[in-house]
Amino acid sequence: NLYYAPDPSSQIACSIGGNVAENAGGVHCLKYGLTVHNLLKIEVQTLDGEALTLGSDALDSPGFDLLALFTGSEGMLGVTTEVTVKLLPKQPVARVLLASFDSVEKAGLAVGNIIANGIIPGGLEMMDNLSIRAAEDFIHAGYPVDAEAILLCELDGVESDVQEDCERVN
Protein backbone atom coordinates (compact mmCIF):
# COMPACT_ATOMS: atom_id res chain seq x y z
CA ASN A 1 0.00 0.00 0.00
CA LEU A 2 1.46 3.29 -1.14
CA TYR A 3 0.18 6.82 -0.65
CA TYR A 4 0.98 10.45 -1.45
CA ALA A 5 1.85 12.15 1.86
CA PRO A 6 0.73 15.80 1.47
CA ASP A 7 -2.88 16.18 2.55
CA PRO A 8 -3.97 19.81 2.41
CA SER A 9 -7.24 20.64 4.12
CA SER A 10 -8.66 21.47 0.68
CA GLN A 11 -7.97 17.91 -0.54
CA ILE A 12 -11.62 17.25 -1.36
CA ALA A 13 -11.56 19.99 -4.01
CA CYS A 14 -7.92 20.73 -4.87
CA SER A 15 -5.79 19.48 -7.75
CA ILE A 16 -2.21 18.24 -7.81
CA GLY A 17 -1.31 21.21 -10.03
CA GLY A 18 -2.72 23.54 -7.40
CA ASN A 19 -0.72 21.73 -4.73
CA VAL A 20 2.45 22.33 -6.76
CA ALA A 21 1.57 26.00 -7.33
CA GLU A 22 0.99 26.57 -3.61
CA ASN A 23 3.48 24.03 -2.19
CA ALA A 24 0.61 22.59 -0.17
CA GLY A 25 1.16 20.63 3.02
CA GLY A 26 -1.41 19.57 5.57
CA VAL A 27 -1.35 18.03 9.04
CA HIS A 28 1.21 15.40 8.00
CA CYS A 29 3.83 17.85 6.69
CA LEU A 30 5.87 17.92 9.91
CA LYS A 31 6.96 14.31 9.39
CA TYR A 32 6.41 13.78 5.67
CA GLY A 33 7.07 17.21 4.18
CA LEU A 34 5.32 19.65 1.90
CA THR A 35 4.51 19.07 -1.76
CA VAL A 36 8.07 20.06 -2.76
CA HIS A 37 9.46 17.21 -0.63
CA ASN A 38 7.18 14.70 -2.34
CA LEU A 39 7.82 15.54 -5.99
CA LEU A 40 10.25 13.78 -8.28
CA LYS A 41 9.61 15.62 -11.51
CA ILE A 42 7.25 18.15 -13.06
CA GLU A 43 6.69 19.29 -16.59
CA VAL A 44 5.87 22.96 -16.96
CA GLN A 45 4.93 25.48 -19.60
CA THR A 46 6.72 28.77 -18.95
CA LEU A 47 5.12 32.14 -19.53
CA ASP A 48 6.96 32.48 -22.85
CA GLY A 49 5.67 29.08 -24.02
CA GLU A 50 8.79 26.98 -23.38
CA ALA A 51 8.19 23.41 -22.18
CA LEU A 52 10.54 22.35 -19.36
CA THR A 53 11.08 19.20 -17.33
CA LEU A 54 12.27 19.93 -13.79
CA GLY A 55 13.62 17.27 -11.43
CA SER A 56 14.11 13.65 -12.45
CA ASP A 57 12.87 10.14 -11.79
CA ALA A 58 15.65 9.77 -9.19
CA LEU A 59 15.28 11.04 -5.63
CA ASP A 60 18.18 13.45 -6.09
CA SER A 61 19.53 15.18 -9.17
CA PRO A 62 22.62 17.39 -9.59
CA GLY A 63 22.57 21.11 -10.27
CA PHE A 64 20.28 23.92 -9.20
CA ASP A 65 16.99 22.80 -7.65
CA LEU A 66 14.67 24.41 -10.18
CA LEU A 67 11.91 22.02 -9.11
CA ALA A 68 11.93 23.63 -5.64
CA LEU A 69 12.05 27.12 -7.18
CA PHE A 70 8.98 26.43 -9.33
CA THR A 71 7.04 24.67 -6.54
CA GLY A 72 5.13 27.29 -4.57
CA SER A 73 5.60 30.02 -7.18
CA GLU A 74 1.79 30.31 -7.47
CA GLY A 75 1.84 30.19 -11.27
CA MET A 76 4.10 33.23 -11.60
CA LEU A 77 6.77 31.18 -13.42
CA GLY A 78 4.45 29.05 -15.53
CA VAL A 79 1.86 26.29 -15.45
CA THR A 80 2.42 22.72 -14.30
CA THR A 81 1.26 20.26 -16.97
CA GLU A 82 2.50 16.93 -15.58
CA VAL A 83 3.63 15.75 -12.15
CA THR A 84 5.60 12.69 -10.99
CA VAL A 85 5.18 12.24 -7.25
CA LYS A 86 7.02 10.23 -4.63
CA LEU A 87 4.81 7.57 -3.05
CA LEU A 88 5.47 6.30 0.46
CA PRO A 89 4.61 2.95 2.01
CA LYS A 90 1.63 3.18 4.36
CA GLN A 91 2.62 2.82 7.98
CA PRO A 92 1.28 -0.39 9.54
CA VAL A 93 -0.10 1.35 12.66
CA ALA A 94 -1.48 4.84 13.29
CA ARG A 95 -3.01 6.10 16.53
CA VAL A 96 -4.45 9.52 17.30
CA LEU A 97 -4.19 11.00 20.77
CA LEU A 98 -6.42 13.89 21.83
CA ALA A 99 -5.21 16.19 24.58
CA SER A 100 -7.22 19.12 25.95
CA PHE A 101 -5.76 22.27 27.50
CA ASP A 102 -7.05 25.22 29.50
CA SER A 103 -5.08 27.65 27.30
CA VAL A 104 -3.78 27.89 23.75
CA GLU A 105 -0.36 28.75 25.18
CA LYS A 106 -0.17 25.44 27.07
CA ALA A 107 -1.16 23.54 23.92
CA GLY A 108 1.59 25.33 22.01
CA LEU A 109 4.14 24.46 24.69
CA ALA A 110 3.05 20.82 24.47
CA VAL A 111 3.83 20.82 20.74
CA GLY A 112 7.35 22.05 21.50
CA ASN A 113 7.78 19.46 24.25
CA ILE A 114 6.71 16.60 21.98
CA ILE A 115 9.21 17.57 19.30
CA ALA A 116 11.97 18.40 21.82
CA ASN A 117 11.65 14.84 23.12
CA GLY A 118 12.46 13.44 19.68
CA ILE A 119 8.93 12.45 18.73
CA ILE A 120 7.91 13.48 15.22
CA PRO A 121 4.17 12.84 14.91
CA GLY A 122 2.72 11.64 11.62
CA GLY A 123 0.13 14.37 12.06
CA LEU A 124 -0.26 17.19 14.54
CA GLU A 125 -3.07 19.70 14.72
CA MET A 126 -3.98 22.29 17.32
CA MET A 127 -7.46 23.77 17.57
CA ASP A 128 -8.56 26.73 19.67
CA ASN A 129 -11.98 26.82 21.33
CA LEU A 130 -13.68 28.59 18.41
CA SER A 131 -12.40 25.91 16.02
CA ILE A 132 -13.33 23.11 18.43
CA ARG A 133 -16.91 24.34 18.70
CA ALA A 134 -17.24 24.90 14.94
CA ALA A 135 -15.93 21.42 14.17
CA GLU A 136 -18.06 19.83 16.87
CA ASP A 137 -21.21 21.56 15.60
CA PHE A 138 -20.49 20.22 12.12
CA ILE A 139 -19.08 16.69 12.59
CA HIS A 140 -19.94 15.77 16.20
CA ALA A 141 -16.54 14.13 16.76
CA GLY A 142 -16.76 14.27 20.54
CA TYR A 143 -14.25 17.10 21.00
CA PRO A 144 -14.38 18.71 24.47
CA VAL A 145 -16.17 22.00 23.75
CA ASP A 146 -15.18 23.39 27.16
CA ALA A 147 -11.44 23.13 26.37
CA GLU A 148 -9.61 26.31 25.37
CA ALA A 149 -7.44 24.23 23.02
CA ILE A 150 -6.91 20.64 21.92
CA LEU A 151 -4.09 18.81 20.21
CA LEU A 152 -4.71 15.92 17.87
CA CYS A 153 -1.44 13.98 17.70
CA GLU A 154 -1.18 11.12 15.21
CA LEU A 155 1.63 8.67 15.89
CA ASP A 156 2.45 6.18 13.15
CA GLY A 157 4.96 3.44 12.40
CA VAL A 158 5.46 -0.10 13.63
CA GLU A 159 3.42 -1.21 16.65
CA SER A 160 6.26 -1.17 19.20
CA ASP A 161 7.43 2.34 18.22
CA VAL A 162 3.90 3.73 18.19
CA GLN A 163 3.18 2.22 21.61
CA GLU A 164 6.39 3.70 23.04
CA ASP A 165 5.68 7.12 21.52
CA CYS A 166 2.10 7.08 22.87
CA GLU A 167 3.43 6.41 26.37
CA ARG A 168 6.02 9.19 26.05
CA VAL A 169 3.45 11.72 24.78
CA ASN A 170 1.01 10.90 27.56
Place the predicted regions along the sequence by residue.
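Noncatalytic alpha-helical scaffold of FAD-dependent oxidoreductases
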Residues: 1-170
